[in-house]
Regions:
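Active-site metal-binding core of divalent-cation-utilizing nuclease and nuclease-like domains
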Residues: 58-144, 156-157
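C-terminal helix of von Willebrand factor
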Residues: 244-265
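Short, well-structured alpha-helical interface segments that form or flank functional binding sites
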Residues: 24, 28, 32, 116, ...
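N-terminal hydrophobic or amphipathic helices/low-complexity stretches enriched
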Residues: 1-13
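Nuclease catalytic cores
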Residues: 14, 18, 22-76, 80-84
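Alpha-helical scaffold elements adjacent to nucleotide-binding pockets in ATP/GTP-utilizing enzyme cores
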Residues: 36, 118, 165-169
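Acidic, metal/cofactor-coordinating or nucleic-acid-engaging core segments within structured domains
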Residues: 128-129, 138-237
Length: 265
């Protein structure tokens, strides 16, 4: 998987000088899926760049063209003032659009309960990244991303409990119109709404929220019988077995990219 990651980064950056990845097969799996999506968006005409952790873009002529994957325990977004040697992300803009988006790996999102939930791969408005990097401390965004992908590089097949846990996580992250007075919610610029940008319209109910976002569980080994029973109602996309060379691998990259090109501004 790592050679494929390096190839995708080379195509986006114009040859990376170094790839600093986190330890563990599961983290490599996340990075593989993340970079495949970014590179596919590039082939479809999107303007795709790597952002350093201080928010600066990596240009082909830069001496420092490394990509850093977040290691250690999950966190929120670190302040840009902490420097450029923390986790990298991707920024992209669709053809003929003025709106930028960011692709994150392993960021903690804050829910209505006040608890945090790690999303393996998330796509959020660029404005959210700018705001969080401007803070003096590590901060989690509040709400759910436009795209949420859970990556499972494990031997056993996915269970119904795994699916329930993902649905529950998304439920806590969903900000509905009736939740404006929930005490844990932060300032408006730190929240993520389905219509932001350009608007701030909140979801009316969880069912709607799931259909105005893209939510995927990608597994190397697929799913056990009964694990996907609730996916249709909750609009969760189960994909597996996803690993290099499989039909599901190519389908996942294409389906996520199709959704982005069709649904994001």
């Amino acid at each position: 998987m790592i050679p494929a990651v390096a190839s995708a980064l080379d195509a986006i950056v114009g040859a990376v000088t170094a790839l600093q990845k986190a330890n563990g097969a599961g983290r490599a799996y996340e990075l593989y899926i993340m970079t495949a999506i970014a590179d596919e968006l590039r082939t479809r005409g999107c303007d795709v760049v790597v952002l350093r952790s201080d928010g600066s873009a990596v240009a082909p002529g830069d001496t420092d063209r490394k990509f850093i994957q977040r290691g250690g325990v999950p966190t929120g977004v670190l302040p840009g003032s902490a420097g450029a040697d923390n986790a990298s992300c991707f920024r992209f803009r669709k053809p003929s659009s003025t709106q930028y988006w960011e692709i994150w790996n392993g960021i903690q999102f804050r829910g209505r309960s006040g608890g945090t939930h790690e999303i393996d791969i998330a796509i959020v408005p660029h404005e959210v990244g700018i705001m969080l990097r401007s803070y003096a401390i590590e901060t989690s965004p509040t709400g759910r991303p436009a795209v949420a992908i859970e990556c499972k590089d494990v031997g056993g097949k996915g269970s119904a409990d795994e699916m329930r846990a993902f649905v529950a996580r998304l439920y806590d992250l969903t900000i509905l119109g009736v939740h404006s007075r929930v005490p844990h919610l932060t300032g408006a610029k730190q929240r993520i709404y389905p219509g932001a940008p350009p608007g701030n319209d909140s979801f009316q109910h969880f069912w709607e929220g799931n259909r105005r976002t893209l939510n995927v569980i990608a597994r190397r080994t697929g799913f056990a019988a009964g694990a996907t029973a609730m996916t249709s109602y909750y609009a969760i996309q189960p994909r597996g077995p996803v690993f290099p060379g499989t039909v599901e691998d190519a389908d996942l990259t294409n389906e996520v990219s199709d959704w982005i090109m069709t649904n994001l501004v």
